[in-house]
Amino acid sequence: MNIDILFLNQELKASDDFINDLSLFEEYCKTHSFEGKANQIIAMPASYSRKNNLTYLVGLGEIEDSQELYELGIKVGSKIKEDVEIDFLNAENNIVPIIDGILYAQYKFNDYKSEDESAINNITFNQTDTTENEIKQSSIFWVRDQINTPLSLIHI
Protein backbone atom coordinates (compact mmCIF):
# COMPACT_ATOMS: atom_id res chain seq x y z
CA MET A 1 0.00 0.00 0.00
CA ASN A 2 1.27 3.48 -0.84
CA ILE A 3 0.71 6.35 1.53
CA ASP A 4 1.75 9.97 1.42
CA ILE A 5 2.64 12.12 4.40
CA LEU A 6 1.87 15.76 3.68
CA PHE A 7 3.52 18.18 6.09
CA LEU A 8 1.62 21.41 6.59
CA ASN A 9 2.01 24.48 8.75
CA GLN A 10 -0.81 26.58 10.12
CA GLU A 11 -1.20 28.40 6.81
CA LEU A 12 -1.73 25.04 5.03
CA LYS A 13 0.78 26.22 2.43
CA ALA A 14 1.67 24.06 -0.59
CA SER A 15 -1.41 21.91 -0.19
CA ASP A 16 -2.58 22.98 -3.66
CA ASP A 17 0.38 21.11 -5.20
CA PHE A 18 -0.88 17.80 -3.81
CA ILE A 19 -4.66 18.19 -3.51
CA ASN A 20 -7.26 17.71 -6.28
CA ASP A 21 -9.93 20.15 -5.08
CA LEU A 22 -8.85 22.86 -2.65
CA SER A 23 -12.38 23.81 -1.61
CA LEU A 24 -13.17 20.19 -0.64
CA PHE A 25 -9.82 20.00 1.14
CA GLU A 26 -10.50 23.15 3.15
CA GLU A 27 -13.95 21.87 4.09
CA TYR A 28 -12.44 18.51 5.12
CA CYS A 29 -9.87 20.28 7.30
CA LYS A 30 -12.55 22.43 8.96
CA THR A 31 -14.81 19.43 9.55
CA HIS A 32 -11.97 17.53 11.23
CA SER A 33 -10.58 20.60 13.06
CA PHE A 34 -7.24 20.31 11.29
CA GLU A 35 -5.40 23.63 11.42
CA GLY A 36 -1.80 22.54 10.79
CA LYS A 37 -0.88 22.97 14.44
CA ALA A 38 2.03 21.01 15.86
CA ASN A 39 1.33 17.28 16.29
CA GLN A 40 -2.05 17.31 14.53
CA ILE A 41 -2.49 14.24 12.32
CA ILE A 42 -5.51 13.20 10.27
CA ALA A 43 -5.98 10.75 7.43
CA MET A 44 -7.27 12.23 4.19
CA PRO A 45 -9.13 10.00 1.70
CA ALA A 46 -7.21 8.94 -1.40
CA SER A 47 -9.80 10.62 -3.64
CA TYR A 48 -8.65 14.05 -2.38
CA SER A 49 -5.03 13.41 -3.34
CA ARG A 50 -3.55 14.01 -6.80
CA LYS A 51 -1.66 10.73 -6.45
CA ASN A 52 -4.78 8.86 -5.28
CA ASN A 53 -2.98 7.55 -2.19
CA LEU A 54 -4.13 7.59 1.39
CA THR A 55 -2.55 10.76 2.76
CA TYR A 56 -1.78 11.65 6.35
CA LEU A 57 -1.96 15.38 6.93
CA VAL A 58 0.67 16.21 9.54
CA GLY A 59 0.68 19.58 11.24
CA LEU A 60 4.10 21.02 11.95
CA GLY A 61 3.09 24.29 13.55
CA GLU A 62 6.29 25.74 14.94
CA ILE A 63 8.13 22.42 15.38
CA GLU A 64 11.83 22.61 14.59
CA ASP A 65 13.46 20.62 17.39
CA SER A 66 14.68 17.11 16.47
CA GLN A 67 13.06 15.57 19.55
CA GLU A 68 9.68 17.03 18.61
CA LEU A 69 10.09 15.73 15.05
CA TYR A 70 10.98 12.28 16.44
CA GLU A 71 7.84 12.28 18.62
CA LEU A 72 5.78 13.36 15.61
CA GLY A 73 7.23 10.40 13.69
CA ILE A 74 6.16 8.05 16.50
CA LYS A 75 2.60 9.39 16.23
CA VAL A 76 2.59 8.84 12.48
CA GLY A 77 4.17 5.39 12.85
CA SER A 78 1.55 4.30 15.37
CA LYS A 79 -1.12 4.80 12.69
CA ILE A 80 0.59 2.41 10.26
CA LYS A 81 -0.83 -1.09 10.66
CA GLU A 82 0.42 -2.82 7.50
CA ASP A 83 3.31 -2.91 5.03
CA VAL A 84 3.55 0.44 3.25
CA GLU A 85 5.61 2.58 0.91
CA ILE A 86 5.81 6.16 2.13
CA ASP A 87 6.34 9.38 0.20
CA PHE A 88 7.03 12.59 2.10
CA LEU A 89 5.33 15.62 0.56
CA ASN A 90 6.24 19.22 1.32
CA ALA A 91 9.01 18.08 3.67
CA GLU A 92 11.18 21.10 4.36
CA ASN A 93 12.46 20.04 7.78
CA ASN A 94 15.04 17.41 8.65
CA ILE A 95 13.08 14.19 8.13
CA VAL A 96 15.64 11.81 9.70
CA PRO A 97 14.07 12.07 13.20
CA ILE A 98 10.62 11.59 11.66
CA ILE A 99 11.80 8.44 9.87
CA ASP A 100 13.34 7.16 13.11
CA GLY A 101 10.08 7.76 14.96
CA ILE A 102 8.03 5.97 12.30
CA LEU A 103 10.39 2.98 12.32
CA TYR A 104 10.69 2.73 16.11
CA ALA A 105 6.91 2.86 16.52
CA GLN A 106 6.75 -0.50 14.73
CA TYR A 107 8.40 -2.41 17.61
CA LYS A 108 6.60 -5.48 18.88
CA PHE A 109 7.92 -8.08 21.31
CA ASN A 110 7.17 -11.18 19.27
CA ASP A 111 8.74 -14.03 21.21
CA TYR A 112 5.51 -15.34 22.74
CA LYS A 113 3.11 -14.72 19.86
CA SER A 114 2.31 -16.63 16.69
CA GLU A 115 3.93 -15.37 13.50
CA ASP A 116 0.59 -14.43 11.91
CA GLU A 117 -0.31 -11.86 14.56
CA SER A 118 3.04 -10.37 15.36
CA ALA A 119 4.90 -9.61 12.15
CA ILE A 120 6.58 -6.22 12.17
CA ASN A 121 5.37 -3.94 9.39
CA ASN A 122 7.73 -3.50 6.46
CA ILE A 123 8.01 0.22 5.72
CA THR A 124 9.77 1.57 2.64
CA PHE A 125 10.53 5.25 2.19
CA ASN A 126 10.51 6.34 -1.46
CA GLN A 127 13.08 8.88 -2.59
CA THR A 128 14.97 8.65 0.71
CA ASP A 129 18.01 6.56 1.67
CA THR A 130 17.12 5.02 5.03
CA THR A 131 19.91 2.44 5.36
CA GLU A 132 21.33 4.13 8.46
CA ASN A 133 17.86 4.46 10.02
CA GLU A 134 17.15 0.77 9.41
CA ILE A 135 20.44 -0.28 11.01
CA LYS A 136 19.60 1.80 14.09
CA GLN A 137 16.10 0.29 14.13
CA SER A 138 17.49 -3.24 14.04
CA SER A 139 19.90 -2.48 16.90
CA ILE A 140 17.26 -0.80 19.05
CA PHE A 141 14.76 -3.62 18.48
CA TRP A 142 17.43 -6.19 19.46
CA VAL A 143 18.12 -4.30 22.70
CA ARG A 144 14.40 -4.02 23.45
CA ASP A 145 14.02 -7.76 22.85
CA GLN A 146 16.87 -8.45 25.28
CA ILE A 147 15.27 -6.22 27.91
CA ASN A 148 11.89 -7.93 27.50
CA THR A 149 13.30 -11.47 27.61
CA PRO A 150 13.28 -13.02 31.10
CA LEU A 151 16.79 -13.53 32.45
CA SER A 152 16.16 -17.25 32.89
CA LEU A 153 15.74 -17.58 29.10
CA ILE A 154 18.87 -15.68 28.06
CA HIS A 155 21.74 -18.00 27.15
CA ILE A 156 24.94 -16.39 28.31
Residues of each region from the PLM?
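Short amphipathic alpha-helical segment within the helicase RecA-like ATPase core
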Residues: 1-154
